[in-house]
Each structure stands twice: as structure tokens, then as C-alpha cells.
Amino acid sequence: MFIGIVSLFPEMFRAITDYGVTGRAVKNGLLSVQCWSPRDFTYDRHRTVDDRPYGGGPGMLMMVQPLREAIHAAKAAAGEGAKVIYLSPQGRKLDHTGVCELAANQKMILVCGRYEGIDERVIQTEIDEEWSIGDYVLSGGELPAMTLIDSVARFIPGVLGHQASAEEDSFADGLLDCPHYTRPEVLEGMEVPPVLLSGNHAEIRRWRLKQSLGRTWLRRPELLESLALTDEQAVLLAEFQREHQARQQDYEGNV
């Protein structure tokens, strides 16, 4: 996968290219990340990349000419078929479904805004899609771009040690992930659930599914509203709810 980045701070993306899962993907040739800075397309001695907005008001906008030239350079390097994405609070909110859609692209160019944003005409002429990572404001589009890259890269074949890792992550089936445990078996008096030590793979799968359903019900109940539960899932969720209610009653009785 090729990902081009247009950013005033390309050095920030070393967090993606040099470290962790994405760093290994770059090293192994599964992911190519290249950056273009609008500053490299300025023609004044101050390398100016911001300009005043028409109509006044606080803040500045990214200057049109260097931004467009940087986007054009990224498009030329990417070749045909590259989707140009602007990271913006006004964009579609990134979720698991969106990540899967984006992962189907072989080429993407991510445009990272700064200041108060970019000229609307640049959006109309250069941008294919706008994406957001949440209903809050950041200083620029670099962190959202890194979030998008990290989430999408997990779906590139060969990036993860086991492809099942991506398939079993939270939200992969519309549910939150189940609890996980590693050594030691006992930590400050808290034991690993015995079923995970049993070696019974069918029971382990059942336990994990029940915990996943229960955790979703407790923490993100709205996710369940959009799911058509299987008969097994409905039974397991009902079991979890009964067990949770019993624990709550025991706790209240001991307080």
C-alpha cells in the first residue's frame, strides 16, 4: 500500500515509519509512506505557508498555492487511482467499517490541515473524501492521519503476525474485545479464569464470546442495537446478564 502525506510537519510521521507494527510494515516493503511539505513549494525567503482569511476573523488558513502544489506532487508520485483524503472535523467519523473500506485502497494521499484549515475551493477541487477521528479539535491533521494509517495498515496482508489478530480485534464483529490474561496465573490475589487454563478450545471460544458480548452490553450498549445476534450470542448474553446481576446483588448485600 502507498500512502502519501501532505503536512507542514513531515518529521512527525517517523512515529509511523520507524516504530511498531507500521514500522515493520515499511521495513518489509508492505507499506510505503512518503511525505510532501507545502514549505518546499514556497517561493519567498520566509517560506510562508499561511494567509489571512477573507472576511476577517481570528486565525489563518493554509496558503493555497504551496498546498495545491504539494498535493499535485503527491498525486504525481502516487500515479492513477490514488484517493485524496483531508483529515477534518467536518469529515465522516472513522470507525471499523470505514477502516475496512479505506484498507481496500492501494493508494491514498492524506492532507493534514493546520491553522484554521484550508480554502474550501481546495477541498472542492483536490479532495475526494473528508474523514474525522472524533468530535473534538486538534492542532492539525497529523495525529488523525497517523491514527488512520495505523488502523488501515493492520489489514494489509502480512503486516500482523496472524491475520486473525485483525479479525478478532474489538469492533471486527461489531463487539468489544474480551478480557485478556498472561502470566502470572495469580496477580495480587486475582486469578486467571480457570477456563483459559483448561485447554478446552470450544469452552474458551464460548467464554470469550460471552465476555465480548457482556463487555459490549456494559460499556457500549448502542453497538448491540445494530446487531442481529445469533441464537448462541443471545443465549450467552442472557447468561452474562444473569451472572452480572447476581454479582451486583452479592456486592450490595455485603456493603
UniProtKB/Swiss-Prot annotation:
GO molecular function, one term: tRNA (guanine(37)-N1)-methyltransferase activity
CDD domains reported for this sequence: TrmD-like
Nuclease recorded as keyword: no
Superkingdom in the source lineage: Bacteria
UniProt KW keywords: Cytoplasm, Methyltransferase, S-adenosyl-L-methionine, Transferase, tRNA processing
Alphabetical list of InterPro entries matching this protein: Alpha/beta_knot_MTases, tRNA_m1G_MeTrfase_C_sf, tRNA_m1G_MeTrfase_TrmD, tRNA_m1G_MTases_N, tRNA_MeTrfase_TRMD/TRM10
Hydrolase recorded as keyword: no
GO BP terms in the entry: tRNA N1-guanine methylation
Gene Ontology CC terms, in alphabetical order: cytosol
EC number(s) on file: 2.1.1.228
Catalytic reaction list: guanosine(37) in tRNA + S-adenosyl-L-methionine = N(1)-methylguanosine(37) in tRNA + S-adenosyl-L-homocysteine + H(+)
SUPFAM superfamilies, per the entry: alpha/beta knot
Residues the entry annotates as binding S-adenosyl-L-methionine: 113, 133-138
Family affiliation: Belongs to the RNA methyltransferase TrmD family.
Quaternary structure annotation from Swiss-Prot or TrEMBL: Homodimer.
Protein name per the record: tRNA (guanine-N(1)-)-methyltransferase
Taxonomic source organism: Serratia marcescens
